[in-house]
Amino acid sequence: MKVKIISYSLSKGGAAKAARNFLHLATKNKKYKSEMISVSGTLKDGVLFKASRLSVYWHYSKMLVSRLLTYFILNDKNIKCSLNIFDSNYVLKHMKEGETQKSVIHINWVNNDTISLFSLAKLFENKSERIILTLHDEWFYCASEHYAKYNSLCYITGYDDSDFINSYIFNLKKKINFDNVVITVPSYWLYERAKKSLLLRNSEIYILPNYIDTNIFTELKEVRSKRHRILGVPEDAFIIGFGAVSGGVNPLKGFDLLLSALDKVLSKINDKNRIVLLTFGANDIDKRVTSLGCNIINMGVISNSYNMAEIYNYLDVMIVPSRVESFGQVAAESLACKTPVIAFDYSGIKDIVTHQRSGLLAEPFSVDSLALNISSFMNMTEKERYVYGENGRDDVVRKFGETVVSEIYFKLIDYVRGVEDEE
């Protein structure tokens, strides 16, 4: 039986990583013949079949037009918006290619005009299709925005006609029939939000956590024992981690909140060089960090999971100051490496970090509370922090390990296929 996993990207961003992990799980099950289809190509049996340059360039030109239109939206410009008024011809073609009655289409993050709302409506309306739709953000039940503004109820009540583009996109989504689609979300927070939403409140929704490879993301004792020497910092240095695909550019990742909190913490410390801020996810160091006065190390863009695991093992604590996370991939990977996490007590991160067990959760989005939690970790002994890390790994293995997630995923695939298709 074929399982076709659809995603805008094969590798860039947390949603692509989650989709690729689903491919990894499906590939290990001999019942399924799986592949991952993206704008840039198809990954099948470990081989990448690239889309033509013309196909990619044509798609990017459509993306550009769509993106230009988003500048007329009345939303907060800090929140990503997508219209999905165009399709990737490559994705549509390969999604239908070789399809059989037993094929399952697993749609992941398909914004950036991977599949248009018009094509999604046709696909979802077809009762012969077997579809799993995984939400990686709030776009499917909002209008154009990927996350509803904090305390906004538009996704529940609808959008004002004065906001023409958002109103138009939301009305297009209202015409989509989700009855034939099984929807999954990675966290309880996203489940509750989707169930409250005007568009998905009557839909069939299940929690399918993101899979964490706990064989790769694990404690590396040799790396941890030599971390200060590897980084060239004092043996008593306290190493704080922060990472995001776009570095500090994306305001949803909360880098500004972390900087303000660190400024408060460092103002009470004489030897600021003992504090190390290690960043990753962008090649350039954010200029705002230079004013902190502490030791800054930027690891750049990390595309290899093994290298990422090493970085988590360098840290005393990983800080995830995001204003919103549908899941919290970085937090889960860090805990799997036995590195505790500080975050805000909000959104999907609450499924991952347990306050005073595997990390500390600050009051949303209080700089003072975040600073207090950083200071609390700094004042702990290494042994006390290690207990947090051990608890975190236990939780990740139990909730997001291969055995648990694959069981849920395979049951959903078989459920979508229908009892009559069971072999």
Predicted regions and their residues:
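Carbohydrate-associated surface elements
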Residues: 189, 211
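Conserved acidic donor-binding segment of nucleotide-sugar-dependent glycosyltransferases
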Residues: 355-356, 360-367, 376-382
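Conserved donor-binding/catalytic core segment of Leloir-type glycosyltransferases
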Residues: 184, 234-253, 259-262
